[in-house]
Amino acid sequence: MEETSLFINFETLDLARVYLFGGVKYLDLLLVLSIIDVLTGVIKAWKFKKLRSRSAWFGYVRKLLNFFAVILANVIDTVLNLNGVLTFGTVLFYIANEGLSITENLAQIGVKIPSSITDRLQTIENEKEQSKNNADKAAG
């Protein structure tokens, strides 16, 4: 007689993780940073009274799509036999992105951030705005 258990078989989950993500390093860090980013984003929105469920859902979907991008990178990595280089690079990109987002959220919440970091964030924001303005001018 087969016994049913309510406990999760973590070995099966680990196999699924390796199959989907290729056992790439720092995936756990990306997950933790994504959760911290969501939490700091919610705190920031709450502080500025801009907490909207629709905006939050779009943010959650974006986070989920980041992990889909890692899965896609792993598939391409496997097909092209790149030994995990593309997947690792993709994870590092998203880790850097999450780190920037968390730092921006913390600065807007009012947490003291070293000036060297805030100066670099301001430079990145200015470059983003300049690129967007150039794209808008080119479009029309």
From Swiss-Prot:
Pfam families: Phage_holin_4_1. InterPro entries: Phage_holin_4_1. The chain crosses the membrane at residues 26-43, 64-86. It is found in: Cell membrane. The keyword Ribosomal protein does not apply. It is a multi-pass membrane protein. Keywords: Cell membrane, Membrane, Transmembrane, Transmembrane helix. GO terms for cellular component: plasma membrane. Its main location: membrane. NCBIfam families: holin_tox_secr (TIGR01593). Belongs to the bacteriophage holin family. Cp-1 holin subfamily. This is Uncharacterized protein YqxH. It comes from Bacillus subtilis (strain 168). The gene is yqxH.
